[in-house]
Structure formats: structure tokens, C-alpha cells
Amino acid sequence: MKYFEKRFLDVYRPLYIGVIFLGIILDLVTKFLVILYFEPHRYLEVLGSFFRMTLTFNTGFVFGAFQDNAIPSLIATGIAIVFLIGYRWKNYDLGNPWGWNLVMAGAFGNFLDKFFVKIPGTGFRFGFQPNVGEYIGVVDFLDFDWPDFLLFSRWPAFNVADSCVTIGLTILIFTMKLEEEK
């Protein structure tokens, strides 16, 4: 048991766990506020057309896999989280711990979001079967316009959890590359 306790504290220090929980809470609170105050597919221009807040629902997994299928998407996300925890446990000295923590926060934030039906103007309820006027899927709301050389005129909307994963992976890639060069 002592090995487990030491290993757990090496990998998941209290500060790191706090960062993970902070990321999850920030993600879920922002999603709740957007559900409460926005109508689906209506937008609020924050910085003109460059940055808008638009309530959308992503019913798939990575790159739209399992679109409109809540249970397979939930299972795939759960498997990804178990893989991340196991990989981090085995390779706890690989990469930057802050990068790992951000990836975990984002993965858990979107995973938890998949357990709820969204009711615009009201909030959430636990479940996977929406009634009329209700939605399933992960709440996305950060909507940016990028230069026209991209294949689409607007970048797909995303959320705080997606941002945590992207920033965390960027940190991990750079730190692992630096470790490799040493």
C-alpha cells in the first residue's frame, strides 16, 4: 500500500489534482452559463465577426466519430481517459506535469458533459435521451473566424475543456521534444 501512496503522490500531487479540478469546474460552469443564457446556433459578437459566442452541440467524438451516438462516444472518451491515466502512471517522469494536468482536466470536463441532456434556458438534466427542445452532446461555444485560406470559413466552435487539451498537448509536445534533444 505504501508503494501505491508514494507513486500516487509522485504522479498526482495535491496541487496537480487542484489544477485538474479547477479546469473541470471552469469548463462545466462556463457550459452551464452558456446553456442558461444562449439559444442554440444564435451568436453574440464579442470581437466583431472574428470572435463570437455561439451555442452548439458536438454529438460525436474526435473529428466527429460516433456522431449522434451518445453511448459509443461516452465509451470511447472513457477508454481514452483510462489510457491517459495509465500512460501517465507508467511514464510519470515523461513530459511536463502541467501539460498532463491540462489534458486530464479537458478530457474529464468533456466526459462529464456527455452524461447530461442540455435544456437551453434551463440547464442540464442527467440522461442520454433528449425530449423536444433538448440536446445531447458536448457544449461548444467559443467561435473564431480564421483567414480564408482554410477549407472552411469559421473554425469549429470549441469549449474550455478543448482549450485545456490543446494547450496541454502543446506543452507536452514541446517539453518532450526538448527532453529528446538532451
Curated annotation (Swiss-Prot):
One of its GO terms (cellular component) is plasma membrane. Pathway: Protein modification; lipoprotein biosynthesis (signal peptide cleavage). It holds the Pfam family Peptidase_A8. It is a multi-pass membrane protein. It catalyses: Release of signal peptides from bacterial membrane prolipoproteins. Hydrolyzes -Xaa-Yaa-Zaa-|-(S,diacylglyceryl)Cys-, in which Xaa is hydrophobic (preferably Leu), and Yaa (Ala or Ser) and Zaa (Gly or Ala) have small, neutral side chains. Its main location: membrane. Keywords: Aspartyl protease, Cell inner membrane, Cell membrane, Hydrolase, Membrane, Protease, Transmembrane, Transmembrane helix. Its EC number is 3.4.23.36. The active site is at D140, D162. One of its GO terms (biological process) is proteolysis. This protein specifically catalyzes the removal of signal peptides from prolipoproteins. HAMAP family: LspA. This is Lipoprotein signal peptidase. It comes from Leptospira borgpetersenii serovar Hardjo-bovis (strain JB197).
